[in-house]
Every structure is written in structure tokens, then in C-alpha cells.
Curated annotation (Swiss-Prot):
Protein name: Transcription factor bHLH167
Domain of life where this protein originates: Eukaryota
Annotated region (Disordered), positions in chain: 1-22
Subcellular locations according to the entry: Nucleus
GO biological process, one term: regulation of DNA-templated transcription
Any one Gene Ontology cellular component term annotated for this protein: cytoplasm
Pfam families: HLH (PF00010)
InterPro entries on file: bHLH_dom, HLH_DNA-bd_sf, MASH1/Ascl1a-like
Keyword terms, alphabetized: DNA-binding, Nucleus, Transcription, Transcription regulation
Chain ranges of the bHLH domain: 14-63
Chain ranges passing through the membrane: none
Family in the record: Belongs to the bHLH protein family.
Length: 181
């Protein structure tokens, strides 16, 4: 009987230790989660846990409202764009850049109602990227402006990086208009 009591006590102490370990792990996990939450919500000062949870909840509600607002704005903009495209009164800029060997050709079509991009700005991009402009044209047809630039690399061994030119041209285009991708 004494032996059974010892075994029973051994089991209860090991169960107690297991519970204590689980509780310690749970506390450590919660402490870690609260520190992550704190870093996202208020990185400037340390808040007590109840205030931190309140602030996190209000922050999440604010983010959700912001997402809903942006979704609605996107939907109305897309509907407006489609309506304007059907009416023919609005055209988003279309940029295409093709390169072959040491020659590069850029075509840009923009709506005439948008603020104009200056041809010399586009030409200077090509020259700064190490290209000699062979031809630069600007045409106004109906409600559209078409820019065409054909350039050749000054040093054919080095060539021209079309992606870099495209990036710089897009910065100029979208600096003049508001466009949400």
C-alpha cells in the first residue's frame, strides 16, 4: 500500500510539472505575440496589455475601413475608365519599347487632354542612356498624341538597356498624370 501511494504521488507530481511547463510555454508564447503586436501598433512607447489590445483593435478596424474605401475607389475608377473609353474621351498612355541589336524604338500614345510630355525630355532620356537619336516624331491626330523615337547605341558593344529607358519614360509620363495601377 505504501508503494502504491509513492507511485500515485509520482504521477501527480509529473502531471503538475507538465501543467507548469505547458503554462510556462503558453505565457512565453503570449508574451512573444504581445511584443509583436506592440511593435506593429505603437513602436514609440510601451503600453499595458489592455491598452495595447484596444489600440490594435481600433487600428485593425481603421485598416479594414481603408481597404473597403480603396476597393470602392478602384471600382468607381474602373467603371469611369471603361465609360470614358467607350465615349472615346479618355485614353490611358500606351508605351511600347522594342530593341533589336543596337537599335531601340519607342512608341508612346497619349490622350490629347492630358498634359503634354515634351519631346525633348524623351530625347534627353535616350541620350543620357548612351543612345544617339536617329529619328524623333510627334504627331497630333484627333484626340491623341503619338511620340515615336528611334535611336541607336553610341557604342554598339555596350548597347542600350530598354528596361531602364522604359522606367525613366514611365516616370515622366506618370509625373504628369495621375494613374493608379
Amino acid at each position: 500500500m505504501g508503494r502504491a501511494r509513492e507511485i500515485g504521488e509520482g504521477n501527480s507530481s509529473s502531471l503538475r510539472e507538465q501543467r507548469n511547463l505547458r503554462e510556462k510555454d503558453r505565457r512565453m508564447r503570449m508574451k512573444h505575440l504581445f511584443s509583436i503586436l506592440s511593435s506593429h501598433v505603437s513602436p514609440t512607447r510601451k503600453l499595458p496589455v489592455p491598452h495595447l489590445i484596444d489600440q490594435a483593435t481600433s487600428y485593425m478596424i481603421q485598416l479594414k475601413e481603408n481597404v473597403n474605401y480603396l476597393k470602392e475607389k478602384k471600382r468607381t475608377l474602373l467603371q469611369g475608365e471603361l465609360g470614358n473609353l467607350y465615349e472615346g474621351s479618355f485614353l490611358l498612355p500606351k508605351l511600347s519599347i522594342r530593341s533589336r541589336d543596337s537599335t531601340i524604338e519607342m512608341n508612346l500614345i497619349m490622350d490629347l487632354n492630358m498634359k503634354r510630355v515634351m519631346l525633348h525630355e524623351l530625347v534627353s532620356i535616350f541620350e543620357e542612356e548612351g543612345a544617339q537619336v536617329m529619328s524623333a516624331n510627334l504627331q497630333n491626330l484627333n484626340d491623341r498624341t503619338t511620340y515615336t523615337i528611334i535611336a541607336q547605341a553610341i557604342i554598339s558593344r555596350i548597347g542600350i538597356d530598354p528596361s531602364r529607358i522604359e522606367e525613366r519614360v514611365r516616370k515622366i509620363i506618370y509625373g504628369y498624370i495621375y494613374f493608379e495601377a
